[in-house]
């Protein structure tokens, strides 16, 4: 049986943030995994990736177990005692953990490292600049709650 991971988001940054969860799933099964994503260039050189395909090709695989990241919980809510609803919102937690939580686990601090491997030659434009690339600018973000407590 092939283990597959469907990264169910079209956003590039959110797709990159799925890398630690994909790696952990691969390690849990002790096998390389098939990746289904709209951003295959991010996963082409990952050592734990068996193959990288567009999500439309999932149905062509026989004997495959698919782990669907992100989509199963984004926007979902549950009702608390008393009727108040709580919504799963990825803007309120680390997006890397959001992918993991969609599979029922969390990542340790050591597992949160996000590595993008670029070992294949890339196509150059006429002026010698790489045509397609990803720039990652790690930084700190703003606080989720920015309004005064008195409100």
Predicted segments with their positions:
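Catalytic machinery of carbohydrate-active enzymes
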Residues: 1-151
